[in-house]
């Protein structure tokens, strides 16, 4: 084959294969550290493998979820803090799996950028690996797409894909959810990964930079505080499901807040009544509400307001479920109950405490 000395190369077009290979070398140890029963977490092949029998399943139903982290990546890019956004990526998908009673088994990521920086990408994958280990799932593959002309240099986007399993007959929500069941809330770690277009607009209007001390948490920067990773609820919720047998349903509070997410796990004839005075509203939400002049109902439909997961449990087992979740490291509060729906599916009593 003739080698044209002056011919164009892929690198001339902006795609650096050598940088991609360097990235693979950097992340292999991180990926290997996520190995679990059923997967060796080795990368480099054309596909990742998972052995359900080795993982201990006998009659499993597979559950899949995928998600991203929205414009939270813009804050990571602008601050240069890339080592936590991968935790968000994992959490957004695996929290959706546990809502259905499934144990996360494996995860795959998609990373797209304009110009590949192996150090930045490896920092992101390091966060993904942390999230996978905490969720108990193996990182078995992914895609790195360098696309000059589509993304600006320095910009990137992420998507994650998770697959879990539950034994047949154990999936949530249960068919026995009924009026009178108790509703408890599991505390969030912060804004998590939803509503960041509004967050960024509020920060811009405030005139503050991401490097200044956070008005609601002066011990850290505003950017660092807003990049607090999404909480992973997998191990605590699976423990509560398995040890108590009293968890009838779970709702991951993401985009749409309480208003749109809770009805997704309820039969159509049922709703939920929440006492807002029982919510411990995190300082970040108080600041956003005040700085942005956000109405209470808008706040409840946009952000988690301090509760990242809702559990619907048997009324007679509330104390047992709360004890298990607390022992697993969760901060839990009773919020209300399931009701017969006669209009709005989510009914709010009292008001959020938004005083700074």
From Swiss-Prot:
It is an enzyme of class 6 (ligase). It is found in: Cytoplasm. Its main location: cytoplasm. Keywords: ATP-binding, Cytoplasm, Ligase, Nucleotide-binding, Purine biosynthesis. SUPFAM superfamilies: PurM C-terminal domain-like, PurM N-terminal domain-like. GO terms for cellular component: cytosol. It comes from the Bacteria. Pfam families: AIRS (PF00586), AIRS_C (PF02769). One of its GO terms (molecular function) is ATP binding. Pathway: Purine metabolism; IMP biosynthesis via de novo pathway; 5-amino-1-(5-phospho-D-ribosyl)imidazole from N(2)-formyl-N(1)-(5-phospho-D-ribosyl)glycinamide: step 2/2. Its EC number is 6.3.3.1. CDD domains: PurM. It catalyses: 2-formamido-N(1)-(5-O-phospho-beta-D-ribosyl)acetamidine + ATP = 5-amino-1-(5-phospho-beta-D-ribosyl)imidazole + ADP + phosphate + H(+). InterPro entries: PurM-like_C_dom, PurM-like_C_sf, PurM-like_N, PurM-like_N_sf, PurM_cligase. One of its GO terms (biological process) is adenine biosynthetic process. Coiled coil: none annotated. HAMAP family: AIRS. Belongs to the AIR synthase family. This is Phosphoribosylformylglycinamidine cyclo-ligase.
